[in-house]
Amino acid sequence: MRSMNLTKNAKFESVRKNIEHYLSTDWFMWVCFLIACFITVLRVEVIGLLIFAAIICAILVFCEDVIVALEPFLLLCLCLIKCNNSYDEFIKMVWLAVPAAAAIIFHFNYYQRKLPHGELFWPMLAVSVAVTLGGLGKITAKEYFSLMPIFFTLGLGFGMLLFYNLMNSHVRLRENYSLPDKISKIMIIMGLFCCFMILEYYGEHLDKVISTHGLLAFQWRNNASTFLIFALPFAFLRSIKGNHGWFWVGMLFYGCMMITGSRGGAIVGTAEVMMCMIALLCLDKRHRIHNIIIIAVGIVMFFVFFWDLIYFFRDMLLRLLQIDDNEIRVRLMRRAVEDFLSNPVFGRGLGYFGNRDVHHSAKGALC
């Protein structure tokens, strides 16, 4: 089938390989980064969805290597984290599912490969079964088969198993580049764009920062800090393996994570940086003395500006230290225990909406 496709589409193959070569370059990754920056500055997330959807569809058609689509996909996800409660706006874009499905079907048909069972197949299968059977005996058939629950149940259940098998067959070691190196570049560019979003927001509201001498509160801070948590280790990894300048990129990620004001980001990010520092000192022997000096200076600067930092981060620290019993997170934790005890084997399931009295999720979302 593969050889027949190549013979039949020789002209397409010639054009395709040239396009794939460009789309696989670092230059194209930075072009996507700049597009995402313009989308953020101009506040045109809906147009951004169209642009990146077109880019991803083009990649699926012209690129055998699906890893190329990862960077624009992550940048698109970051662009959309600002769009809170936008179900009514984005549901109008549901027609995009048609070209997206066509591109996906074309890709996995034209670039056919066997679907081997990877090392995680059986654990993924167990998770898929658990998600599918979730809520058994506790929710009604109407609740289970309503639109949003069944969408998430299929997508996060056997849909993820199918996705894993497809990716496992198409993402493989390449001769022209190192896969770990490629992924680290993608994650770092994603992190840099996230930093751009945060710093751009601070720049736009700089007068408020100066007047309050404190953090800005914004709706998407937890999402942004989550993306930075994923990106941060890759900067330190590149610092260990190559240019020491990547160390400062990692510190930029941590700094931006802190100024989001996310409590989870502050806790996890600080622990993550500490682990990365330990790895850096143990593995990067060439710059060990240099790194020790930098860390020592950083600790001294922290204590010199201790009270200034405490004042700047006061809102986050207060929210971290003064957790009220009626806070949504605390009530949800309590409710989680109750829900588990009510059905220890199958749980409540993704179709259960009985916790909306504690936290009313956005339209089109489960939580």
Where are the regions that the model predicts?
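N-terminal signal-anchor transmembrane segment
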Residues: 2-108, 133-137
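Membrane-interfacial loop-to-transmembrane alpha-helix junctions, especially the N-terminal start
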Residues: 26-28, 61-74, 113-126, 179-187, ...
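Structural signal for the C-terminal ends of transmembrane alpha-helices
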Residues: 41, 57-66, 101-114, 162-176, ...
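Membrane-interface micro-motifs in multi-pass membrane enzymes
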Residues: 42-48, 86-95, 148-152, 215-228, ...
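Alpha-helical transmembrane segments of multi-pass inner-membrane proteins
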Residues: 53-56, 132, 154, 158-162, ...
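Aromatic-anchored transmembrane helix interface
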Residues: 90-101, 119-132, 141-168, 182, ...
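A membrane-periplasm/extracellular boundary helix in multi-pass inner-membrane enzymes
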Residues: 199, 259-260, 280-321, 337-341, ...
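Long extracytoplasmic/lumenal interhelical loops at the membrane interface
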Residues: 323-334, 338-342, 346-367
